[in-house]
From Swiss-Prot:
Gene Ontology CC entries for this record: cytosol
Ranges spanned by the short sequence motif 'KMSKS' region, renumbered to the chain: 521-525
Primary location: cytoplasm
Entries under CDD domains matching the protein: Anticodon_Ia_Val, ValRS_core
Gene that specifies this protein: valS
Record protein name field: Valine--tRNA ligase
Pfam family of the protein (one): Anticodon_1
Domain notes: ValRS has two distinct active sites: one for aminoacylation and one for editing. The misactivated threonine is translocated from the active site to the editing site.
């Protein structure tokens, strides 16, 4: 009664299924007001490109939670959306246009932004197709974009309110500057890596002609902006020169020697040039000493007029020319090559320039304090694993003001205008009425500013009467990587606390990074990246989802390998095959699964239903604790080991027998267990479970809306569990003996079971059909009083010893000759190892691991030899 193919084919199983779910509106919330709401908003992927394995991991966890809660009866919302990803997307589009010979400045802002929208539309469609291939049960009727009308309204509201509260301000500060993209960068957009560089040791002469001091710098091109040289307070070497003036080499400007706590007297010469416009520490020193700030570079990284004859040169070109001139003029003492960590733009790859710039900032301390205070309350955000709460607290305790303006065209335009005549600043959600007299700030907001509002802006805020906001906010869980706790998670928390007085989500579930098989981070440079869509094409979405959830723990990295994907496919194929077996063994008029009659259970039934009960309880508990790897192991062990390896095999006795009543009971049990397994696994592997569930007798249009399995008190039976475990141990022990003596399962053998006490005898007596079916005994003797035969294979299990006499199974003379030959081989191996290990040259000079390996081999050979000698003795005594 089945149309299931003999072999699991994920492409056939998954083809068209997602569209069927969409057509049935199965992804929308139930709208049942009696049900508890459960919501997750998807961490919005950037529209810069396609999804990677990290996205697949994120969403596999989220969708598993949503499907699990939906089946538990919750009113679930899984809200989709994407991020405009300002700098990242603009950089991609600019690179594309450059290949076409186009420049955004020549195109103009409006035309360029239209090009970016076209890019967004293209990649949004790609991302949605990838979501569908992953099987994500997203409610597309609520899809959001960080630049859509509703979110733009929320962004303006937040900016204006923070400005009016004095928490947003405009000022000059040192920021990370990308000279290629000509914009400020947030810290997360700066990648630090080791570069070859140099310390340039330069003479700074005293203005009174009394000599010079030696200054070491890695960026001599910034010396045009030097306004002081600093020493550590109280440094005895320099106490007599503090207050004196120096002449800036090649420039001629006089600068003072000052004392400041920023200087480390142990580092270098203990003298530091201070360039307030080009170094964050120097900026603070300059503020403390009221030093002038001199910016020496243009936006594109070329030198400005402050650099004199070097004006117009690229900063690195200037460095080379300046060092040459310093040498010719006698100011250069030496050049000391070094390797040092230098910040690079994540997007353009160029060295970032610390640079003074007028930017918009968020005053962070008051907002961070709210987060710290909330984490002490009952309404705190729970972190899984818990240790990452300390990461959040650390960032909030050591927070700096957040630069939120970006010199880009793609993004939320800052809602600030400057009066053309008076220079007055106006900040508002709407433009000034006399707009002709005002000019809007050309900058846009940092992408993180809008994504920080994601959990509540997607629910209709600032309209607090919006039905979605009232029902589904705060959300229940955020699933993301531990690497963006500061850059995104913390910002969502403080914005939500400030504007809604609520935490944005109850739980933050963190995962690590997906690495390659060798443990390396996946990257373009290594060429080890994996496209999740390629994996799905080969193995199916269910196998990828199973891999991503099974065997992983919250907060831990995982390694991708095709060996693991093979194992995932094999497990699903096992479920496919056992489902096919069960369905094929059902009668034509089989009814949907219903609660079985436990009074008719035999031992195997009592055992499997107790194991099923335990598995359902554990998987449900572990899902609730976000321990998906542990839940996967519980499910795997039950399905593969208990159900497939044992209960199915035991059931074949009844299914192939003549007792129609017993056969019917087994069929009812099998359909119930299979139904429960498919429901249990549906949140992780939605496609195959839907296909299999619809192929068996069922009620309802989709397994997605079926109820999740629950435990039943009447299925609990620890006695049956223990008794069946004993029976299984007996069967496994005899099977192992058969393998050791090469006795095929078709042959009959004598089996003697010596019980520690007779309490377990009834287990074997009452299940003699199963014992005979699995063990094929010629003669079975069970007693507490059995003497071990002289020639026998023995196995010891809890509660019993098992003997299989070998007299009729082996030719004693042939076996003896074989064993003596094996003993000679092992003696030779032991002698070889002894000789090698007694060689002092080998022991003293070979790597420790090699020596230890040799010792392990010798111990293994000695152990094998001992067993062979015992076998020889037994054979001799049997003659």
């Amino acid at each position: 009664m089945t149309d299931l193919a003999p072999k699991y084919n994920p492409n056939e199983v998954e083809k068209g299924r997602y569209q069927e779910w969409l057509d049935e509106d199965l992804f929308k919330p139930s709208g049942d007001k009696k049900a508890h709401p459960y919501s997750i908003v998807i961490p919005p992927p950037n529209v810069t490109g396609k999804l990677h394995l990290g996205h697949a991991w994120d969403t596999a966890i989220q969708d598993t939670l949503i499907r699990f809660k939906r089946m538990e009866g919750y009113d679930t919302l899984y809200l989709p959306g994407m991020d405009h990803a300002g700098i990242a997307t603009q950089a991609k589009v600019e690179a594309k246009l450059r290949k076409q010979g186009k420049d955004r400045h020549e195109m103009g802002r409006e035309a360029f932004v239209k090009q970016v929208w076209d890019w967004k539309d293209e990649y949004a469609n790609i991302i949605k197709s990838q979501w569908s291939k992953l099987g994500l049960s997203l409610d597309y009727s609520r899809e959001r974009f960080t630049l859509d009308k509703g979110l733009s309204k929320a962004v303006k509201k937040v900016f204006v309110q923070l400005y009016n509260e004095g928490l947003i301000y405009r000022g000059e500060y040192i920021i990370n500057w990308d000279p290629t993209l000509e914009t400020a960068l947030s810290d997360i957009e700066v990648i630090h890596k080791d570069d070859k560089g140099a310390f340039y040791h330069v003479k700074y002469p005293f203005a009174d002609g009394s000599g010079f001091v030696e200054i070491a710098t890695t960026r001599p091109e910034t010396m045009f902006g030097d306004t002081a040289v600093a020493v550590a307070p109280g440094d005895p070497r320099y106490k007599d020169i503090v207050g004196k003036e120096l002449i800036l080499p090649l420039v001629g400007r006089h600068i003072p020697i000052i004392e400041d706590q920023h200087v480390d007297p142990e580092f270098g010469t203990g003298l530091v040039k201070i360039t307030p416009a080009h170094d964050p520490n120097d900026f603070q020193v300059g503020n403390r000493h009221n030093l002038k700030r001199i910016n020496v570079m243009n936006d594109d990284g070329t030198m400005n007029e402050e650099a004199g004859k070097y004006a117009g040169m690229d900063r690195f070109e200037c460095r080379e020319a300046l060092v040459k001139d310093l040498k010719e003029e006698g100011y250069l003492i030496k050049v000391e090559p070094i390797v040092h960590s230098v910040g690079h733009s994540e997007r353009s790859g160029v060295q970032v320039e610390p640079r003074l710039s007028k930017q918009w900032f968020v005053k962070m301390k008051p907002l961070a304090d709210k987060v710290l205070e909330n984490q002490k309350s009952e309404g705190k955000v729970n972190f899984v694993p818990e240790r990452f709460e300390q990461t959040l607290n650390h960032w909030m305790e050591n927070v700096h003001d957040w630069v939120i303006s970006r010199q880009l065209w793609w993004g939320h335009r800052i809602p600030a205008w400057y009066n053309k005549k008076t220079g007055e600043t106006y900040v508002g959600e709407e433009a000034p009425k006399d707009i002709e007299n005002w000019e809007q700030d050309p900058d846009v907001l940092d992408t993180w500013f809008s994504s920080a509002l994601w959990p509540f802006s997607t629910m209709g805020w600032p309209d607090t009467d919006n039905p979605d906001f009232k029902r589904y906010f705060p959300t229940n869980a955020l699933v993301t990587g531990y690497d963006i706790i500061f850059f995104w998670v913390s910002r969502m928390i403080f914005q939500s606390l400030h504007f809604t007085k609520e935490r944005p989500f109850k739980d933050v579930v963190l995962h690590g990074l997906i690495r390659d098989e060798q443990g390396r981070k996946m990257s373009k440079s290594l060429g080890n990246g994996i496209d999740p869509m390629d994996v799905i094409d080969k193995y199916g979405a269910d196998a990828l989802r199973w891999f991503l959830l099974n065997g992983t723990a919250p907060g831990q990295d995982t390694r991708f390998s095709y060996t693991k994907m093979d194992a995932a496919w094999n497990f699903i194929n096992k479920i496919w095959n056992v489902s096919r077996f069960v369905i094929m063994n059902l009668p034509e008029d089989a009814k949907p699964a219903h609660m079985p009659d436990t009074s008719k259970f035999d031992l195997s039934d009592k055992w499997i239903f107790d194991r099923l009960n335990h598995t359902i309880g554990e998987v449900t508990r572990l899902f609730g604790e976000y321990q998906f790897g542990e839940a996967g192991r519980e499910a795997y062990n039950f399905i593969w080991n208990d159900f497939c390896d044992w209960y199915i095999e035991i059931s074949k006795v009844a299914l192939n027998g003549d007792d129609e009543e017993l056969k019917a009971r087994k069929q009812e049990n099998l359909i119930w267990i299979l139904d429960q397994i498919l429901r249990l696994m549906h949140p992780i592997m939605p496609f195959v479970t839907e296909k299999l569930w619809l192929s068996m007798p069922h009620e309802g249009k989709s397994i997605m809306t079926a109820s999740y399995p629950v435990t039943h008190k009447e299925f609990e039976n620890k006695t049956a569990d223990q008794e069946m475990d004993f029976l299984i141990e007996v069967i496994k022990a005899v099977r192992n003996i058969r393998m050791e003596v090469n006795a095929p399962m078709s042959s009959e053998i004598d089996i003697m079971i010596k019980l520690d006490d007779l309490n377990n005898k009834h287990i074997l007596d009452e299940n003699v059909d199963y014992v005979e079916n699995f063990l094929h005994p010629k003669k079975l003797e069970v007693s507490a009083d059995i003497e071990a035969p002289k020639l026998a294979k023995t196995a010891v299990i809890p509660g019993a010893q098992i003997f299989v006499p070998l007299t009729e199974l082996v030719n004693v003379d042939e076996e003896l000759a074989k064993m003596e030959k094996e003993a000679k081989r092992l003696e030779d191996e032991v002698a070889r190892c002894e000789k090698k290990l007694s060689n002092k040259g080998f022991v003293d000079h070979a790597p420790e691991a090699v020596v230890n390996k040799e010792k392990e081999k010798m111990a293994d050979y000695e152990s094998q030899l001992s067993g062979v000698r015992e076998r020889i003795q037994d054979l001799k005594e049997s003659k």
